[in-house]
């Protein structure tokens, strides 16, 4: 082979090898691209980087490997459903009341484990209903329970425990120091109003979401006191009735509007109609209705209708079937704008529910003492009418058994508030037949349904002879 042929042969071989190297590089690139598109999340992909020499120089093909990590991170944020303030709903329809819970606290106190209480009530949050009571700082039948008939001592405190359970060591929570109280849930947080101190210089502490946020100081210097049952909240504003002044003479009565634990305003209850007002039992039926106790002049009960801004109406329940204790025999006078001036004092805490022109009234069976309990429906009993008639009577505690205070509470359901009430069943002093040194209570509760109820008797049921003295 002559020199020219050798040069031509070397050139052809060089060109052929360069072409092959170029094709290999292109093939690697295509293969790499296809594999990369098929790789899933969170996998390590190895991409070869190809360095191809210039076509005239076919000596080597250099392949360098780089590791690339591909991570797709998804963050899921779970948030609690936003709590809303309670809206102004109507009362649910109802035709009667049905037994709900009974704590049997005195019967269970035979072994001295139960806390001495009085002035119990019930209030509910979004999830549960709770029993509240004013504890005496003593256990049933212990030496410290001697003399617990007293209403106001520095040892009394507001406690909370699950509805239907007795207040025993381990199941209750102390809310505040108090010998008078009211509590309500605004849809987001609990608010408590707690009165304590000297009779002539007491104060009310307002607790919201577990923190002390505001206060009320006694202005009449005569036993500042409040409802002894739940207050009511609409749209975040809670309404509380407060009294200061004599128990059997002209006193001062105020309504406070409180938002998130801070007092927004208060108004004096006009005395044009209401002569005396204390221990109101309030519920929501679009507006707030309060049925209260006249401890001075009336065996008929004073009432108020209130919204988020002002007192809208006041008066006395018209019904000629009165519901305070003591009271005259049925029927009595119709008095819508003033107290009856018959068996006016002292009185007992009670409740009622307006139902159109009708009214449901809870009352002791006895007209003179705190024994028995019944709820009656009085047709046209909310208005001044000659047609008042007892259309329903449910006797829930027989007249042979002790009762006491009673009050309303409401339970939020779909689109309305269910009307409910509790009855305090007092045992011990001052009952002469209860030969013990203490005064305490159990509680029974009922709720309204749009059905016909049955009948029964739900007394305290404890045998005082079995109880610690």
UniProtKB/Swiss-Prot annotation:
Active-site residue list: 151, 405
MF annotations from Gene Ontology: exo-alpha-sialidase activity; metal ion binding
Residues on Virion surface side: 30-469
Primary localisation category: virion
Residues binding substrate, per UniProt: 118, 152, 278-279, 293, 370
Record's keyword terms, sorted: Calcium, Disulfide bond, Glycoprotein, Glycosidase, Host cell membrane, Host membrane, Hydrolase, Membrane, Metal-binding, Signal-anchor, Transmembrane, Transmembrane helix, Virion
Post-translational modification note: N-glycosylated.
Its membrane topology: Single-pass type II membrane protein
Name of the protein in question: Neuraminidase
Organism: Influenza A virus (strain A/Turkey/Oregon/1971 H7N3)
């Amino acid at each position: 082979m002559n020199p020219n042929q050798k040069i031509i042969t070397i050139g052809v071989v060089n060109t052929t090898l360069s072409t092959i190297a170029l094709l290999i590089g292109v093939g690697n690139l295509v293969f790499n691209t296809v594999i990369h598109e098929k790789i899933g999340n969170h996998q390590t992909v190895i991409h070869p980087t190809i360095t191809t020499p210039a076509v005239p120089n076919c000596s080597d093909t250099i392949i360098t490997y780089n590791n690339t990590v591909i991570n797709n991170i998804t963050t899921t944020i779970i948030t609690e459903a936003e709590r809303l303030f309670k809206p102004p709903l109507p009362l649910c329809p109802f035709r009667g009341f049905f037994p709900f819970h009974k704590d049997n606290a005195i019967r269970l106190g035979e072994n001295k484990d139960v806390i001495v209480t009085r002035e119990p009530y019930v209030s509910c949050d979004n999830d549960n209903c709770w029993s509240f009571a004013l504890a005496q700082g003593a256990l049933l039948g212990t030496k410290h329970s001697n003399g617990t008939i007293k209403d106001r001592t520095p040892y009394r405190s507001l406690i909370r425990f699950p509805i239907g359970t007795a207040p025993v060591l381990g199941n209750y929570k102390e809310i505040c120091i108090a010998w008078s109280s009211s509590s309500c849930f605004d849809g987001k947080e609990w608010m408590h109003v707690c009165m304590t101190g000297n009779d002539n210089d007491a104060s009310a502490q307002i607790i919201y979401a577990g923190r002390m946020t505001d206060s009320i100081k006694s202005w009449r210097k005569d036993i500042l006191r409040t409802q002894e049952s739940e207050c009511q909240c609409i749209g975040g504003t809670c309404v509380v009735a407060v009294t200061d002044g004599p128990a059997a003479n002209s006193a001062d009565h105020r309504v406070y509007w409180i938002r998130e634990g801070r007092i927004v305003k208060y108004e004096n209850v006009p005395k044009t109609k209401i002569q005396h007002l204390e221990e109101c039992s309030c519920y929501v039926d679009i507006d707030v209705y309060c049925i209260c106790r006249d401890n001075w002049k009336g065996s008929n009960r004073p009432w108020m209708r209130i919204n988020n801004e002002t007192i809208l109406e006041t008066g006395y329940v018209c019904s000629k079937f009165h519901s305070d204790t003591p009271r005259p025999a049925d029927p009595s006078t119709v008095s819508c704008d003033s107290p009856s001036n018959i068996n006016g004092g002292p009185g007992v805490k009670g409740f009622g529910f307006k139902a159109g022109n009708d009214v449901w009234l809870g009352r002791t069976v006895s007209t003179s003492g705190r024994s028995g309990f019944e709820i009656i429906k009085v047709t046209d009993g909310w208005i001044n009418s000659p047609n008042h008639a007892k259309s329903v009577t449910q006797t829930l505690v027989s007249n042979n058994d002790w009762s006491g205070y009673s009050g309303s509470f409401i339970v939020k359901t779909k689109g309305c508030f269910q009307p409910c009430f509790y009855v305090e069943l007092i045992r011990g002093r001052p009952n002469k037949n209860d030969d013990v040194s203490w005064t305490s209570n159990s509680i029974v509760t009922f709720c309204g349904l749009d059905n016909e109820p049955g009948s029964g008797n739900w007394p305290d049921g404890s045998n005082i002879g079995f109880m610690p003295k």
